[in-house]
Amino acid sequence: MEIDKVKNIFRQTYLADASRKENDAEHAWHMAIMAVLLSEYSNEKIDVLKTMTMLLIHDIVEIDAGDTYAYDEDGKKTQRQRELAAADRIFGLLPSDQAEYMRGLWDEFEERKTPEAKFARTLDNIQPVMLNNASGGRSWEEKCVHLNQILKRNENTKDGSETLWDYAYNNFIKPNVEKGKIKED
């Protein structure tokens, strides 16, 4: 039942209808579906089931570590340490074979070296951009997010899919800069 706690970890991104903020369970589910539907846009051939599983567990450490907002520079200073400790505890609850498999997938996601991890990271970066656009840029506007912050956070997004990054930039980010929802530098 430990995994049920991800339903109570709320992110800074609003749902598409802007009615409330998204939780980690919704975020993971949304990206797992995206992996199935958008896998053809991966730069490299990927194992879709492996990518889905990676996406479903990638934020499970936030049960202990909490969600670190994408543009929270102070929070990022301790994020890795908090998440490693959380991974040890949470994956340690599983039988050893499952713990080893799941922890391996989590580590792979964090390292961003395999085609699956690169594509999963692309989706993890693009999904909140999609939601921010759909909600009228609400979170970006509330947090006074600047274009340079978004570009820095997404500097490796194209590694998983150049096509999806180009689409997200031109259809979600650029129009929100033009509308003033994202601050220009």
Residue ranges of each PLM-predicted region?
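Alpha-helical, largely C-terminal catalytic domains
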Residues: M1-D185
